[in-house]
Amino acid sequence: MTQKLVTKPFIEVLSGNRQASPPMWMMRQAGRYLPEYRATRAEAGSFLDLCFNAKLAAEVTLQPIRRFGFDAAIIFSDILVVPYALGRAVRFEVGEGPRLDPLNSPDLVGTLNGAIDLSKLEPVFEALRIVRSELAPETTLIGFCGAPFTVATYMVAGQGTSDQHPARLMAYQHPGAFARIIDVLVESSIQYLLKQLEAGADVLQIFDTWGGILPPREFEKWCIEPTRRIVEGVRKVSPGAKIIGFPRGAGAMLPDFIARTGVDAVSIDWTAEPNMIRERVQSKVAVQGNLDPLLLIAGGSALDQGVDDVLKNFSAGRHIFNLGHGITPDAPVAHVEQMVKRVRAYKG
């Protein structure tokens, strides 16, 4: 008896095959909007305790899959585990977000450890193995890292800021020191992503949350080029690796991003202009996005219209339905259910 071949709709889209009903998931789908997540988080203690408890991290990764039947699970972790594995002190203050010891001068950058200690991230890899063993074969497992520029913004400032100006200023005033941070993060990210593939990830996503704040010349230098190096480095070892880029806010710079980096897909935020995306981006790679997360708070007819607009704009090509950024903690579960039902009913 021959075994039935299982296809993953998510992988099909990344491989060039449009799906009549687009596969879907949500950025930050394992999060505080879910009561089961809040209960598990309370059991774990701190946010980092949850990230580094393989059993509990696997549990919260699986929770939105059980509840909504998404086509992809993304491992529960954080982009700042890479600085942690580089020996930087990383902590999360309640209500204030991440805190690190800042690398805000060339002398301090000189203290940066250049080699990542992957053993510190073993709980992430173990969580991937657990999730992979429990996921249905047709469900895709996503691993991820932060893009070097975005991670560097937190490392330089020691926290998030409204426009991440400390890192941008260092890049202008001390480009050699800033390049040193980027180089370390590129090599560390390659190693980290390869270990995630080894642990069971099917797809990788590179989150450049702050890339879109850069002007074109700096976007090319600090966003496109480091991402290209990561993609190249991963594929040198794993030639078939499927990789999604998310240079949030890149807008008109997206065509250059996809042409230069070699990603299989790009996530787009809700401000992306649909005609440009269809003509200059989706004609080359798959597109993921791009519902405004605020619509999941609004609900009702506004949410329905937003879902319909995304489907109308992108379903004729290769498309993965997602949000334009992460779901917020105050989004009602019922509104997520409303969105899922509407997307699943679509046959384009």
Swiss-Prot record:
What InterPro entries does the database record attribute to this sequence? UROD/MetE-like_sf, Uroporphyrinogen_deCO2ase_HemE, Uroporphyrinogen_deCOase
Q: Which GO terms describe its biological process?
A: protoporphyrinogen IX biosynthetic process from glutamate
Query: According to UniProt, where does the site described as Transition state stabilizer lie?
Result: 78
Major localisation: cytoplasm
State a single Gene Ontology molecular function. Answer: uroporphyrinogen decarboxylase activity
Pathway of action: Porphyrin-containing compound metabolism; protoporphyrin-IX biosynthesis; coproporphyrinogen-III from 5-aminolevulinate: step 4/4
Subcellular location per the Swiss-Prot or TrEMBL entry: Cytoplasm
Task: Give the GO cellular component terms, alphabetically.
Answer: cytosol
* Keywords noted in UniProt: Cytoplasm, Decarboxylase, Lyase, Porphyrin biosynthesis
- Is Ubl conjugation given among the entry's keywords? no
Q: Cytoplasm: is it a keyword of this entry?
A: yes
Residue ranges the record marks as coiled coil: none
Q: Catalytic activity annotated for this protein?
A: uroporphyrinogen III + 4 H(+) = coproporphyrinogen III + 4 CO2
The record describes the protein's role as: Catalyzes the decarboxylation of four acetate groups of uroporphyrinogen-III to yield coproporphyrinogen-III.
Family per record: Belongs to the uroporphyrinogen decarboxylase family.
Complex and partners: Homodimer.
The protein's name is Uroporphyrinogen decarboxylase
The scientific name of the source species is: Rhodopseudomonas palustris (strain HaA2)
| Gene name as annotated | hemE
